[in-house]
Amino acid sequence: MEDSDSAAKQLGLAEAAAVAAAAAVAAAAAAAAESEAEEPVLSRDEDSEEDADSEAERETRRVTAVAVMAAESGHMDMGTEALPSPDEAAAAAAFAEVTTVTVANVGSSADNVFTTSVANAASISGHVLSGRTALQIGDSLNTEKATLIVVHTDGSIVETTGLKGPAAPLTPGPQSPPTPLAPGQEKGGTKYNWDPSVYDSELPVRCRNISGTLYKSRLGSGGRGRCIKQGENWYSPTEFEAMAGRASSKDWKRSIRYAGRPLQCLIQDGILNPHAASCTCAACCDDMTLSGPVRLFVPYKRRKKENELPTTPVKKDSPKNITLLPATAATTFTVTPSGQITTSGALTFDRASTVEATAVISESPAQGDVFAGATVQEAGVQPPCRVGHPEPHYPGYQDSCQIAPFPEAALPTSHPKIVLTSLPALAVPPSTPTKAVSPTVVSGLEMSEHRSWLYLEEMVNSLLNTAQQLKTLFEQAKQASSCREAAVTQARMQVDAERKEQSCVNCGREAMSECTGCHKVNYCSTFCQRKDWKDHQHVCGQSASVTVQADDVHVEESVIEKVAV
């Protein structure tokens, strides 16, 4: 009985030690997560090493064993030692018990629930324990990395490196089903990776060193709608920003942060829906008894700049082919868009030929630009003779002249030159191959040439007559312009003189009246006349007396009668 009682007590101590060890594992994971959250800035080498480790471990999908052992130095293993036999366990039952905790990575990223099985591996004589207890470590534990942890029963941790992600406190009991995802939390639905608590109705926010709680149901347009509670007071996002000392920024969406990111990120992912400035709902009016329509904020879409290049590909210019017809062999000039000219075949040009050729340009998408009738020396056209005939000899128009070939120095192959000439009467492409030219055709060409010279002479004469007429008209217009300018100048001088005569003597303005005594001084008003009268009265009286003396009438003595008094 005493052995059984002591074994039962040891069993109770072992179970208590297992629960305490599991709690220590969770506390160690939480401490590691907090240390990583407080120090998000890592060196470049550490980031690269952790990324490499996480990728390698995702591919292998390992299962890591976590061993929780007693404080005795003889059992300080990393989980590789075999479990003790029943006799050894009975001898060491008074000191410690070995418990194995297995943490398995979960393949699905949507289900972040870890289940931990704690099994009593030690055996006591006469009592074999086969019970299993399920523990839930946390819903949001990161599955990227998990390593071996050795925890003593006294709570001290031997190794906690490599465990990433926050962990919730251990909750002994049956395994709970995973928490369903909120709407919009599906994979690929948001731009940023958010914690599930972001879908709560209340969010802890911060602006500089001031923290508050944002209530989504009371969010308005930013300037209106007191949705942030700080202490016992309610503030709108703009007021909360100003209280934190960021009023000059005037951008509460980037000043106020949640989980290290500005609220603009929540708005972009559709988690927060601010109202428009013209909204008249209850939240914007700060009166929950109202029921006005809700107008959501619509972000402004920037227009594309006008100077942006079009998205359609630029059409490349196809090279143009220039064919000289007629010729002995088909010869093609290819003009590339860069301006380079390439030829195919050999050409022989007549430098001194005077054949009346016609340049015809035809628009064809396949062949390009075709010039027909160039001064190309053909096989049927002979060089001019040395007797004195300037015209070349054609087949069927032979005479007794001896045709001498060109000397080698005068051959056009050394300095080739293309001469294109055109006539108004012959600007037609040849429809048939070149045939023998008859004498009537040659005479017709000579007549057409003479007619064209006459036409050019008449045109030059008409141009000369027109130029002479234009010169005469130019001289007449020049004389008329000078006369008009002289008349305008004379009229202007007369007007200026009249203005000077009729100006007020006192102030210089335009005069409206004149002095009734002498009729020589003008005034604009009675005020100027009274002001100038002190000086003018002497001049006005003298001129009147002089006028009277000049008007005296002399009477002869014979006419005067003596009157007795």
Swiss-Prot record:
Q: Which residues cross the membrane?
A: none
Q: Which UniProt keywords apply?
A: Developmental protein, DNA-binding, Metal-binding, Neurogenesis, Nucleus, Phosphoprotein, Secreted, Transcription, Transcription regulation, Zinc, Zinc-finger
- The entry marks the following residues as binding Zn(2+) 2, namely C515, C518, H536, C540
Compositionally skewed regions (Pro residues) per UniProt: 169-181
Q: Which InterPro entries does the annotation name?
A: SAND-like_dom_sf, SAND_dom, TF_DEAF-1, Znf_MYND
Domain (SAND) ranges: 193-273
Q: Which residues carry this modification: Phosphoserine?
A: S176, S443, S448
Highest taxon of source: Eukaryota
User: Where is the motif Nuclear localization signal annotated in this sequence?
Assistant: 301-316
Locate the residues binding Zn(2+) 1: C504, C507, C524, C528
In this UniProt entry, the residues modified to Phosphothreonine are T171, T179, T432
This protein's GO cellular component annotations are:
cytoplasm; extracellular region; nucleus; RNA polymerase II transcription regulator complex
Q: In its keyword annotation, does this UniProt entry include Ion transport? A: no
GO BP annotations of the record are: behavioral fear response; embryonic skeletal system development; negative regulation of DNA-templated transcription; negative regulation of transcription by RNA polymerase II; neural tube closure; positive regulation of DNA-templated transcription; positive regulation of transcription by RNA polymerase II; regulation of mammary gland epithelial cell proliferation
By its UniProt entry, which SMART domains does this protein fall under?
A: SAND
Q: Molecular function terms in GO for this entry?
A: DNA-binding transcription factor activity, RNA polymerase II-specific; DNA-binding transcription repressor activity, RNA polymerase II-specific; RNA polymerase II transcription regulatory region sequence-specific DNA binding; zinc ion binding
Q: Where is this region: Interaction with LMO4?
A: 403-478
Ranges where the record places region Disordered: 29-62, 162-189
Kindly state the tissue distribution recorded for this protein. Ubiquitous. Detected in brain, spleen, adrenal, lung, skeletal muscle, liver, kidney, and in developing germ cells in testis. In pituitary, restricted to hormone-secreting cell types.
Provide the assembly information: Homodimer. Interacts with LMO4; LMO4 blocks export from nucleus. Interacts with LMO2 and CLIM2. May interact with the corepressors NCOR1 and NCRO2. Identified in a complex with XRCC5 and XRCC6. Interacts (via the SAND domain) with the DNA-PK complex subunit XRCC6; the interaction is direct and may be inhibited by DNA-binding.
Report the protein name in the record. Answer: Deformed epidermal autoregulatory factor 1 homolog
